[in-house]
A protein has these predicted regions:
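Flavin-dependent oxidoreductase catalytic cores
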Residues: 1-293
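Single conserved hydrophobic/aromatic residue that forms the stacking wall/gate
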Residues: 292-300
Length: 300
């Protein structure tokens, strides 16, 4: 009997030739924050291997959203290069997706050109740097930046967009009580903490229209005491469904809490094996799961 993995699947307006998706893992192949031939060749080779869709990773919706110096930044002048990339992917029979996001406080002035911004002000050990909390009157424009990036993705020929709302980046910083210490209508209760995500999704769905698939990557658990837990993340998932998202990419963890980044220590293999089993999949119905860790069975 043929595996269901290799049968077509439809979410929203998009049908894939099979159920395999190259997840939006950061490539670091965009010198000058623009697509390169290396990025094109990489995704073309993935598509040629028979995958259903390959996802270009972690494109910043604004310059302030950049975490890395070889990260894609969505702006009109890079559209011709992105069009070459999507044409190459489509020529191999695969769909082309792109992940859109903003790093929030996960940056440094030397990368993003300004003092990093986030849900709340403070000091981020990851960078390390001081962070300015976004004012409430700045949030509508930030949400519109997501919508503009979706329009640019459409112009570049992408079939789907994936909104990054996990891993401790900007949307996740608003959602998590660990990083959202606001006293206004965007902080406090979960309903308030979801308010910025709601604004983003409204702009995204408006720009996506009826012919572009929208995925959202979200945490099912932040992975540390004081972070989001399953009871709240299930409510976030339902809200995203109500917003019109066609699929959820279920994940977990906070980059800024990872000891290999903050303290440059050894990876916490024992605790990471908890995520190896993808325990959250039982909570999904129509889901796209994030690639799990493959670990050796013996110490090496």
């Amino acid at each position: 009997m043929e595996s269901k993995l290799f049968t077509p699947v439809t979410f929203g307006p998009l049908t894939l030739r099979n159920r395999t998706i190259r997840s939006a893992a950061f490539e670091s192949m965009c010198p000058g924050n623009a697509p390169s031939d290396m990025l094109l060749d990489y995704h073309r080779s993935v598509a040629a291997g028979g995958i259903g869709m390959t996802t270009v990773a972690y494109a910043a919706v604004t310059q302030s959203g950049l975490s890395f110096d070889r990260q894609l930044w969505m702006r009109p002048e890079i559209i011709p290069g992105l069009r070459r990339l999507t044409d190459a992917i489509h020529a191999e029979g695969a769909a082309a997706g792109i992940q859109l996001g903003h790093c929030g406080n996960m940056s440094h002035k030397s990368i993003c050109g300004c003092m990093p911004v986030g849900a709340s002000s403070g000091f981020n050990l990851y960078s390390p740097t001081f962070v300015r909390g976004l004012r409430a009157d700045e949030l509508p424009e930030m949400a519109r930046a997501y919508g503009r990036s979706v329009n640019l993705a459409r112009e570049a020929g992408f079939d789907s967009v994936e909104i990054h709302a996990g891993h401790g980046y900007l949307i996740s910083q608003f959602l998590s009580p660990s990083t959202n210490h606001r006293k206004d209508e965007f902080g406090g209760s979960l309903q308030n903490r979801m308010r910025f995500m709601d604004m983003v999704m409204e702009e995204v769905m408006k720009a996506a229209g009826s012919d572009m698939a929208v995925l959202v990557k979200m945490n099912m658990r932040d992975g540390f005491r004081g972070g989001m837990e399953l009871d709240e993340t299930m409510q976030v998932a339902r809200r995203l469904e109500q917003s019109g998202a066609h699929a959820l990419v279920l994940s977990g963890g906070f980059v800024s809490k990872a000891p290999m980044y903050v303290m440059r220590g050894e990876m916490p293999i024992r605790s990471m094996t908890h995520y190896m089993t993808c325990w959250w999949l039982k909570y999904g119905v129509r889901t796209v799961s994030y690639t799990h860790l493959t670990l050796p069975t013996k110490r090496i």
